[in-house]
Swiss-Prot record:
Protein name per Swiss-Prot or TrEMBL: Large ribosomal subunit protein uL15
Organism: Chelativorans sp. (strain BNC1)
GO molecular function, one term: structural constituent of ribosome
Subunit details: Part of the 50S ribosomal subunit.
Lineage: Bacteria, Pseudomonadati, Pseudomonadota, Alphaproteobacteria, Hyphomicrobiales
Gene3D superfamilies per UniProt: 3.100.10.10
NCBIfam families: rplO_bact (TIGR01071)
């Protein structure tokens, strides 16, 4: 057997249906689109239209709103900060803030600030300057001998 003699097994492939190639073919003229009407024309796909049935996006209720004052924080776990320190990407002696985490590759881009969460463990004595931190994260950092600087809340 040679490469040029290779063939697909019998019944493995199915010939594609060539529509609109004469009425003798059985699928000529209208090409399986029926007769006239919007959907028989080319380029038609009415998004969200379900043939007169009430469309899904109108059957479901409106819900919620977008808070224009909402803040979107980068959430970083203590375990990821410790991993960056262990890999010598972060300096534990220096103050760790959003810019330092960005340069170390811990976060991809800085949003409205960084919020530290307590996932994982931290052993390094670090000083964090962040927009927010969970209570358990602050406890873990202070237990390791570090400190967290949070912004003052406006009264």
């Amino acid at each position: 057997m040679k490469l040029n003699e290779l063939r697909d097994a019998e019944g493995a492939t199915k010939a594609r249906k060539r529509v609109g190639r004469g009425i003798g073919s059985g699928s000529g003229k209208t090409g399986g689109r029926g007769v006239k009407g919007q959907k028989s024309r080319s380029g038609v796909a009415i998004k969200g239209f379900e043939g007169g049935q009430m469309p899904l996006y109108r059957r479901l209720p409106k819900r919620g709103f977008t808070n224009i004052f909402g803040k979107d924080y980068n959430e970083v776990s203590l375990g990821r900060i410790q991993a960056a320190i262990d890999a010598n990407k972060l300096d534990a002696a220096a103050t760790i803030d959003g810019a330092a985490l960005l340069n170390a590759g811990v976060i991809r881009r800085l949003k409205d600030g960084v919020r530290v969460l307590s996932g994982g463990e931290i052993t390094a004595k670090v000083t964090l300057d962040v927009a927010g931190a969970s209570k358990s994260a602050v406890e873990k950092i202070e237990k390791a001998g570090g400190s967290v600087k949070l912004p003052e809340k406006a009264a």
